[in-house]
UniProtKB/Swiss-Prot annotation:
It comes from the Eukaryota. The keyword Metal-binding applies. A ubiquinone binds at H201. The chain crosses the membrane at residues 33-53, 77-98, 113-133, 178-198, 226-246, 288-308, 320-340, 347-367. The cytochrome bc1 complex contains 11 subunits: 3 respiratory subunits (MT-CYB, CYC1 and UQCRFS1), 2 core proteins (UQCRC1 and UQCRC2) and 6 low-molecular weight proteins (UQCRH/QCR6, UQCRB/QCR7, UQCRQ/QCR8, UQCR10/QCR9, UQCR11/QCR10 and a cleavage product of UQCRFS1). This cytochrome bc1 complex then forms a dimer. This is Cytochrome b. Belongs to the cytochrome b family. Its cofactor is heme b. Keywords: Electron transport, Heme, Iron, Membrane, Metal-binding, Mitochondrion, Mitochondrion inner membrane, Respiratory chain, Transmembrane, Transmembrane helix, Transport, Ubiquinone. It is a multi-pass membrane protein. Heme b b562 binds at H83, H182. Its main location: mitochondrion. One of its GO terms (molecular function) is ubiquinol-cytochrome-c reductase activity.
Amino acid sequence: MTIIRKKHPLIKIINHSFIDLPAPSNISSWWNFGSLLGLCLIIQILTGLFLAMHYTSDTATAFSSVTHICRDVNYGWLIRYMHANGASMFFICLFLHVGRGIYYGSYNMIETWNMGIVLLFAVMATAFMGYVLPWGQMSFWGATVITNLLSAIPYIGTTLVEWIWGGFSVDKATLTRFFAFHFILPFIITALVLVHLLFLHETGSNNPTGLNSDADKIPFHPYYTIKDFLGVLILLMAFMILTLFFPDILGDPDNYTPANPLNTPPHIKPEWYFLFAYAILRSIPNKLGGVLALILSIVILAFMPLLHTSKQRALTFRPITQTMYWILVADLLILTWIGGQPVEYPFIIIGQTASIAYFTIIVILMPMAGMFENNILDLD
């Protein structure tokens, strides 16, 4: 078996990636989220495939087909809720994975980090288009509002929006193409994940100290396969509790009303995992400015390696920057809350303050804290 594992051209790749891979001996449970994201992607592709067998991407029948899946298809309700809540679990793991990367300075592996940002954009695009497919009120109006943001692009904006819509409003053509893209994107994401892993295995994993761990490596299997499996069990348990006991807790009640272009919901808002970006978008009174801030809220991650001023890689031994980091986490939670609130006092001013704080912490305060720590630790 050992000979096949090490000699067979295909199994050899798997062996070098998941079995005989040299891994740092001290990586914590924060390093579990990569494998959990892989599991989430598999769950989403499988449940999505079964949903696609019964779904029809036509404005006249889309809502009814989802109802049919829940009522008439064997375990259709389970597949539908697994897919909907699987997206939430996916984003929880994604945010924790990115947060881990920022905390431990993993962004210094630039190729891996940038590939991760591309993956984040791809997953966000997939989730947005998936939310449109049930063709409920929030599906329709969410699609209308978010695609309309492109009209802020000077000169070509309006033409671009109508080109994406396939007409003069969100209609049958829009739904059909969103379904096509929503179906193909997870497979593109799978390919990007392999590239992400390829880049990661060029440098090897980071570790909680941020120090070089070449002198102390252990094989990935059995140590981290067992450790990852525990993470998988915890995730699946949380996932099934969410899906079976609280399936609608993260959804919007408006999406149980069929799409009606003549009736606007009182509060148009995206799914919870986009609320932080939506709050940043809304905090700027100018349309183009809001769109740029929205994009920048994610793109700013690509500048993390340039903004790294500390002589140390991780935040493990840097209490001042640690404080900034946890304020940033709290700020993101505030933005998420504000994104779900109506546009009125005091939510407007809270959202604007939190948006300014978000960019200030990342661009100014954390780099300054890094330089200050170098100074007081005499690391210059």
